[in-house]
């Protein structure tokens, strides 16, 4: 039996950062991970491969250059899965090496196999490939096992015609048509990628809209752009059956509509990977969809056991998981922290990108907080013309009482990079006046901040003149 100060189950973003943070504090650390999943879902089947796939799609289709060279422009006429996955596998390999090297450098013991609780302090790790069993104990334990795609009962997934977001990375050929069930972040990201590749995509969503946590104006802009790529939306519809035949699939909706397509991809949420952990032996149980409940310090109801990352639910982002892992380790060992910041940017890697930080107009209106809006259009930026992005936009929400920046919403090229400027200003309690006075490199997309800041200040100046 091996004894450690802390044992981390799962090597994704949350688990990795928890392990390294603990090691930096001088603690003995073990991390448990399944055989070929070092780096977790993030590196192997989630964030890294999907975002790399997106980059490959943008490059090979020439999507970003069509504004300049015409709608028919492509870097390669016939794009195959091999073209797309070559880049993906290369990046995954590099990321796995990075994770392994970081663990080795910080003297974190990597124990390969499936871990499950024997008692609240003891984990049995079974490596079925090597037929080995290892028992480890930890004064503290952090669960960071992540999630897997949820699969509705009654739907047969054959990994060829009917698949989920994991299986989509193993397609043998690019489908000419596809039904995407679910208009959440993952569904919309993949819908936009395949639409860019020329696949005829239909998105089916049982709610009346999509991405309802985002700014409505930004969502409408994204929907318009996706429709321009021939994406069809079926909102307020529910799938009742998926029939598979030699020619493809037929998706039947509750309304009676039938949609023929070569492939169906389900993006119906995520399921916590907790069913193999034997949590009852640790005095724990799960909530809906296999999630583990924690407090604001990421402690479970068993004080020495923490949980971080997707397995605890919203926001289920790699970036927030990393911070949760670090903070959980710090709390376990009595290291002072300020807690997790409320300013957490959201990034959606659709084509085009969407990103925001802070409040939305809906939230401010519900809270009766007076604000003004400043907007900058990419088509008015020299960088937008150079890059061929005439559709992008940046929106600032500014308090009319003290000029503080309340929210930043971006749609278009580099949105997920650009959002951090607004995040930094908000985090420092800065006002829109800082952006008015700031000097930005020219030509850049970052200039949009100054343009939007000037726009909102001009609106407020006009209002003040009207009051006189």
Curated annotation (Swiss-Prot):
Disulphide bond pairs: none
Q: Which GO terms describe its cellular component?
A: cytosol; peptidoglycan-based cell wall; plasma membrane
Q: Which GO terms describe its biological process?
A: 2-oxoglutarate metabolic process; NADP metabolic process; pyruvate metabolic process
Q: How does the cofactor bind to this protein, according to its record?
A: Binds 1 FAD per subunit.
Gene Ontology molecular functions = dihydrolipoyl dehydrogenase (NADH) activity; flavin adenine dinucleotide binding; NAD(P)+ transhydrogenase (Si-specific) activity
Q: What is its EC number?
A: 1.6.1.1
> What's the catalysed reaction?
NAD(+) + NADPH = NADH + NADP(+)
Keywords on record: Cytoplasm, FAD, Flavoprotein, NAD, NADP, Oxidoreductase
User: What is the recorded name of this protein?
Assistant: Probable soluble pyridine nucleotide transhydrogenase
What SUPFAM superfamilies has UniProt attached to this entry?
FAD/NAD(P)-binding domain, FAD/NAD-linked reductases, dimerisation (C-terminal) domain
Q: Which InterPro entries match?
A: Class-I_Pyr_Nuc-Dis_Oxidored (IPR050151), FAD/NAD-bd_sf (IPR036188), FAD/NAD-binding_dom (IPR023753), FAD/NAD-linked_Rdtase_dimer_sf (IPR016156), Pyr_nuc-diS_OxRdtase (IPR001100), Pyr_nucl-diS_OxRdtase_dimer (IPR004099), STH_gammaproteobact (IPR022962)
Q: Which residues bind FAD?
A: 33-42
């Amino acid at each position: 039996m091996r004894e450690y100060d802390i044992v981390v189950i799962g090597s994704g973003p949350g688990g990795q950062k928890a392990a390294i943070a603990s090691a930096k504090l001088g603690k003995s650390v073990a991390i448990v991970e399944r055989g070929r999943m070092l780096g977790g879902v993030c590196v192997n089947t989630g964030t890294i491969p999907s975002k790399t796939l997106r980059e490959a799609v943008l490059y090979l289709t020439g999507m970003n250059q069509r504004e300049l060279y015409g709608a028919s422009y492509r870097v390669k006429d016939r794009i195959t899965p091999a073209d797309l996955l070559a880049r993906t596998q290369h990046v995954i390999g590099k990321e796995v090496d990075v994770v392994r090297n970081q663990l080795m450098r910080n003297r974190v013991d990597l124990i390969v196999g499936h871990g499950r609780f024997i008692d609240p302090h003891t984990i049995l790790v079974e490596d079925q490939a090597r037929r080995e069993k290892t028992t480890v104990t930890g004064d503290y334990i952090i669960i960071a096992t992540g999630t897997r795609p949820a699969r509705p009962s009654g739907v047969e997934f054959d990994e060829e015609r009917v698949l989920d977001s994991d299986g989509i990375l193993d397609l043998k050929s690019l489908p000419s048509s596809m039904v995407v069930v679910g208009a959440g972040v993952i569904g919309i990201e993949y819908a936009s990628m395949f639409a860019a590749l020329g696949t005829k995509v239909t998105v089916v969503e049982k709610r009346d809209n999509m991405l309802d946590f985002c700014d409505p104006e930004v969502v409408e802009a994204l929907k318009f752009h996706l429709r321009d790529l021939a994406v069809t939306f079926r909102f307020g519809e529910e799938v009742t059956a998926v029939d598979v035949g030699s020619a493809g699939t037929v998706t039947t909706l509750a309304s009676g509509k039938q949609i023929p397509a070569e492939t169906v991809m389900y993006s119906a949420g995520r399921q916590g990977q907790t069913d193999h952990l034997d949590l009852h032996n640790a005095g724990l149980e799960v909530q809906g969809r296999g999630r583990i409940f924690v407090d604001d310090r990421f402690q479970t109801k068993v004080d020495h056991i923490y949980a971080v990352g997707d397995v605890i639910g919203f926001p289920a982002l790699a970036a927030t998981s990393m911070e949760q892992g670090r903070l959980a380790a710090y709390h376990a060992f009595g290291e002072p922290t300020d807690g997790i910041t409320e300013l957490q940017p959201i990034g959606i890697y659709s084509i085009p990108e969407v990103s925001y930080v802070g409040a939305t107009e809906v939230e401010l209106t519900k809270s009766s907080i007076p604000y003004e809006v400043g907007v900058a259009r990419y088509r008015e930026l020299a960088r937008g013309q150079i890059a061929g992005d005439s559709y992008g936009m940046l929106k600032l929400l500014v308090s009319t009482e003290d000029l503080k920046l309340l929210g930043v919403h971006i749609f278009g090229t580099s949105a997920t990079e650009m959002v951090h400027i607004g995040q930094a200003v908000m985090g420092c309690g800065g006002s829109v006046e800082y952006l008015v006075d700031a000097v930005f490199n020219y030509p850049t997309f970052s200039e949009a901040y100054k343009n939007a800041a000037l726009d909102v200040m001009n609106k407020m100046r006009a209002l003040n003149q009207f009051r006189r």
